[in-house]
Structures are given as structure tokens and as C-alpha cells.
Amino acid sequence: MRSCTVSTMPRMICRNADLEFDWLQPCFYPDEDDFYFSGPNSTPPGEDIWKKFELLPTPPLSPSCAFLELSTEPSDWASEMMLTEADLWGNPDEEDVFGPGGLGSLTPNPVILRDCMWSGFSAREKLERAMSEKMQHGHEPAATGPATQVPGAGAASPAGRGHSGTAGAALPAELAHPAAECVDPAVVFLLPVSKRNPVPVRVAPARAPARASAVGAAVARAAAPATAAVAAPPGLSSRPPNGGDHKVLSTSGEDALSDEVDEEEDEEEEIDVVTVEKSCKTGGTTFTLTVSPKNTALGLGREQSRELILQRSVPIYQQHNYAAPSPYVESEDAPPQKKIKREVSPHPLKSVIHPKGKSFSPRKSDSEDSVRRRNHNILERQRRNDLRSSFTTLRDHVPELVKNEKAAKVVILKKACEYVHYLQAKEHQLLMEKEKLQARQQQLLKIIELAWTF
């Protein structure tokens, strides 16, 4: 493969026409087999060319903001990067809570991850030089001691911007315990904080039990007696750290949840059993509610046990006969009805016994209903047959429908009505003729009697 470099080398001819005029050209081409050009200024792919791909070592953790002295000039590049915007511009009036004053007032040695993008081209030489110095200072015996604290480091003033000479000594200690000495700013400062307004915080030890404060507050402790006191909520106890100068801030969501759950368990009262009894005419109904004193927020194993018991004094029967009285008839109203029936009917035994038998023997009532229904069907069928035969007879008596066997019932009734009117008119006419004939008969009888007398 052949190497094609950029502006660091003199202009060379690139065999790839597509990449010849590119601003940044690749160093290798996969379609060429030679290792390097045969030009006079070409460099074989050894250690020199691999330095272009050298990755800078991982930058150390952010230096502590507690190593501040009464100096106006930063000692090294780390102090410059740790200074806030107001300190870099030299404005003492504009103080931010993220500056040395704000952080100093919260904790003596806060270790906050500021920025891990320190591998820029402008800071490359400074980073290499600083790393070598830090490693040299780390091997010295005096550098292993604890970091010193300045009494006035927590005060929000422009005088507290510098760093002491022990800043380099504290860095290896921080590198030795990266997990316990560094926290994410997003965890500590969840909400935007306004300037010059201290936030109420809670202090928690590095390895203390999970009794932390609610998530969202900056957790720290005063650096010196001269620093401003930070208000802590009642009911929260501060414990000294187990060891070391730095304190790990505990702001886990699980710790806050367990703290709130424990407080609720301490405050809540035990509820044994609540029993509510309601008396009805049909029978007593008892509701039993059992509440467990455990809190339900910890999981399914601590859920409240609730029991609902419903008792009825009147048994429920399967009702098939919809015409029969309901089994839920009040027992108090039943005796007056029996008395009324006894007063009205002379033989009340049957009327009293049958409803009782129906209500307490559903099988017997079902059999009686089936017999009654069967008898009703037989009678209905017989009635229909009689009606059909009557229409057939009526049709046979009407002269117009004698030969019409498929005549409808309406036609049969209509023709029969007309025929009845015709017969009535015919009868009236015949009666008139009968009367005339009877009168003529009387006259003829009188004439015969007169003839016999002469």
C-alpha cells in the first residue's frame, strides 16, 4: 500500500483522481500494494507515521476546587480550567454557585467531573507536561499526605481563585479512588440554580446507610466555621465520614425512596380490623375489612390484605317459574296475607298451602306447571279444531261458498252475514203473505157458513 499524506509533506501525486484535490486525504489506499512512495521525502510506515494515530492518554479526574489560595494568578493549566467564567474575566461581583466560592461553601473538597474533552490540539503539550509533573509529584513521599484546606477557601471572593502547591499531590490520590471520589454534576445539580441563592442541602457519609435526602438538592457540608451555614431539614442526621478527606455525595433515587418509605412506616398507625354490620329485613349483612400495617410501596410481598365477607340469612333458590312469588318475600309480611285469605275465603287451606309448597319445593311447582301447560295446550288445540269445523259448516250453508273449499274465514263470515240478511228479508215477506192468506181463509169460511144456512 502506498501512503498519501497531506500538508505536512511536500506535494505528491496521488493516483486516485477522486481524492487528489480533497482537503484531507487518507494516508493509505486499499487498492495499492506498495508500502510507501519511492519519492525523496516519503516516510516509511514506522513509528513516525504511527505517531499521527497516537491517542492521548486518558485525562485525569478534575482537580479539586478546595486547593485555593489567596493568589490572583493561576498556578498551572488545571487551575485555569477549574476557574469559572466570572473568575477568568476578573469580575468579583459575578459569582456563580459552580465557582470556587459556591463549591467551597458546599464542601471542603468537592470533586466534580468538569470536562473530559481535554485532548484538543491547543492543550496537547500542556497535557503531556502536566501529566509528567503530576506523576513525578505522586511518587514523592510528601505528596501522599492528605490535602490541606485553606480556611478562607469557601468564601465567595475573588481572592480565593488560586491553587496551593498540593494540588498536584492530591491528584494521584483521586486517581487511586476514581469511583469513590468523583460524582456526576448531573446527579448533584439536577435543577437550575440561581446565583447568590444558597440551596438547602443535606449531608450524607461516603458509606452510610441509605437514609439520604430527596433527589434534587446539592449535598455538601461547610468547609470552615467562617463559611455560610447551610440549612438542613429537620429529622435528618449528619454522620462523620469513615475515612479520608473527601466525602462522597449520596443522592441515589433508591436511597431517597427507602428513606421516604421508612419515615412513612414510622408515622403510620396500625389498623387492625374494621367491621361494619348493616341489618336489613331480609337478613344481616356483615362486611369485614382487614388492613395490614405494612406499606404497599415496597412490592407485591407487602400488599395490603383485604377480605370481603358477605353473608345472607335467606338461601337463594334457582327460580324457574316466573309466575311464582319470589323467594325473597319478606317473612314479616307473609302472615298478614294468610290472615286476609282466611277471612275472605271459606276454605283457605288450599290457597295457603300451595304458595308455601311452591316456594319451598321448586321441583313440585315445576311439575304442576308442566301439567297445567300441557292441559292448556290440549284445550287450545281442541278449541282451534272446533273453530275450524264451525267455519267449514258455515261455509257449507252459504250457497255461494258451498263449492269453494279454500275460502278464507273473512270471506265466509261476510257471505254468511249477507245470506242471513237475505233470509231475514225472505222470512218477513213470507210472513206477510201468510197473513194475507189467513185473512182470505177467514172470508171464505164465512161465505161457506152463509151458504149452508140458506
Swiss-Prot record:
Q: Name one GO cellular component term.
A: nucleus
Keyword Iron-sulfur among UniProt keywords? no
Q: Where is the bHLH domain?
A: 371-423
Mainly localized where?
Answer: nucleus
Q: Where does it reside? A: Nucleus
Residue stretches of biased makeup (Basic and acidic residues):
363-374
| Region Disordered: start-end pairs | 132-166, 230-269, 325-374
The annotated regions of Acidic residues compositional bias extend over 256-269
Q: Where is this region: Leucine-zipper?
A: 423-444
Q: Where is the composition biased (Low complexity)?
A: 151-161
Q: Which UniProt keywords apply?
A: DNA-binding, Nucleus, Proto-oncogene
Enumerate the GO terms in the molecular function aspect: DNA binding; DNA-binding transcription factor activity; protein dimerization activity
How would you summarize the oligomeric state and partners of this protein?
Efficient DNA binding requires dimerization with another bHLH protein.
Associated condition reads: N-MYC2 proto-oncogene protein is overexpressed in liver tumors. N-MYC2 is totally silent in normal liver and is probably a retroposon. WHV virus activates N-MYC2 by integration.
What name does UniProt use for this protein? Answer: N-myc 2 proto-oncogene protein
Q: Give the organism the record lists.
A: Marmota monax (Woodchuck)
* Upper classification of the organism: Eukaryota, Metazoa, Chordata, Craniata, Vertebrata
